[in-house]
A protein has these predicted regions:
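Conserved NAD+-utilizing ADP-ribose enzyme module
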Residues: 2-27, 52-55, 72-210
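Glycine-rich loop/turn
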Residues: 24-64, 70-75
Length: 210
């Protein structure tokens, strides 16, 4: 196992924690597309047709979860990996207007269904992955944008789009060569969530499964 992930397994990482690359103003999220969608987006520095804003689009702050999802850019329709820098204000707007895809234990089912129906944003917490796609004992957030949220993402939040596909191929080859790829990965750190947003998305406040 690569060094960083062996260490993380031994640490008390909160069960649900947002880890990301971010600055004071921006956070990087990842998406993978077919070249027909990715190439125009990189050229325009925003998502343009054939990107379909009427469909829910999922953004992922975890680079390695994106690699798990796209199979290191080898899955059909996901062969171009994009790093999308968006405003932290926009990202936190999405979290504040979100609903968990599945209710947590103890949630009032009627209240959850009402929020699910009204919210343009879905939150899922899935097992984080190491570079070899092995599940880690804590979760990574995926944020699904639809309706008003998808429009805001496409039109207002994006600060830049970078094609990472060549870098992804380099890391994939290093893995196949049996190398430790820790130093080749984007640096990610815990994202500071205001308490209200942490409650909305169901983030953990302690390193346990709660």
């Amino acid at each position: 196992m690569d060094a960083r992930f062996a260490i993380l397994r031994r640490m008390n990482v909160p069960y649900r924690q947002i880890r990301a690359s971010f600055t004071d103003e921006a956070i990087t999220v990842y998406q993978a597309y077919d070249p027909a969608v990715a190439a125009p987006a990189v050229t325009a520095q925003r998502f343009v047709p054939p990107f379909k804003r009427e469909r829910m689009t999922w953004i992922k702050p975890s680079f390695l979860w994106m690699m798990y999802r796209c199979g290191w850019a080898e899955k059909p329709g996901q062969t171009r990996v994009l790093a999308v820098d968006i405003t932290r204000e926009g990202f936190e707007w999405a979290l504040g207007h979100s609903c968990l895809s599945h209710p947590d234990a103890g949630t009032d089912p009627t209240a959850w269904r009402n929020r699910l129906r009204e919210s343009p944003v879905r939150i899922q917490w899935d097992p984080e992955r190491d570079p070899h796609h092995n599940a880690l004992p804590y979760r990574s957030i995926q944020v699904g944008l639809s309706g008003d949220a998808a429009a805001r993402y496409a039109d207002q939040w994006i600060l830049g789009i970078t094609d990472l596909t060549d870098r992804v191929h380099d890391v994939r080859q290093a893995l196949r060569d049996g190398k430790d790829v820790t130093g080749m990965l984007p640096a990610e750190r815990p994202y500071p969530l205001p308490a209200e947003l942490a409650r909305t998305v169901g983030a953990s406040v302690t390193p346990d499964a709660g």
